[in-house]
UniProtKB/Swiss-Prot annotation:
PROSITE patterns linked: RIBOSOMAL_L6_1 (PS00525)
Name the UniProt record assigns to this protein: Large ribosomal subunit protein uL6
DNA repair among keywords: no
A GO MF label: structural constituent of ribosome
Amino acid sequence: MSRVAKAPVVIPAGVEVKLNGQVITIKGKNGELTRTIHNAVEIQHADNQLTFAPRDGYADAWAQAGTTRSLLNAMVVGVTEGFTKKLQLVGVGYRASVKGNTVNLSVGYSHPVEHQLPAGITAECPTQTEILLKGADKQVIGQVAAELRAYRRPEPYKGKGIRYADEVVRIKEAKKK
């Protein structure tokens, strides 16, 4: 049985929560996020807290309640503080730049790679070899970071490629003669 669902999500000041059936909308200074809740989960909104309870008749109700609690907590953190993800470009001549909502990458192809950012996500390049993604939706930030990384994943012999800032690339030993 999940213990995650037993902890309530505290709603800070300045965050507005609307519960309409199984659709919840959380609005804060960084934007508005909406999510549809699984039928196995029942949510109560009282005195600046969201509490979760499983519904009878569902085998995975406690698991769904714990998952829902984690997702809604991430939504609350996203609309108040926001999320960031940092990518590094490692390799000779690998560069990144941001123009509007487009990330331009020079990562060893014969042409520059242009990646359109979805709504609600902003990117900046503190240096030519770093990309900083910011936004309110944790899932979308991770998805965009994974898409950018997929253009040139770190290779195991020299470590060249696009990597997450906290990623450790294991380097293989070269073949001996």
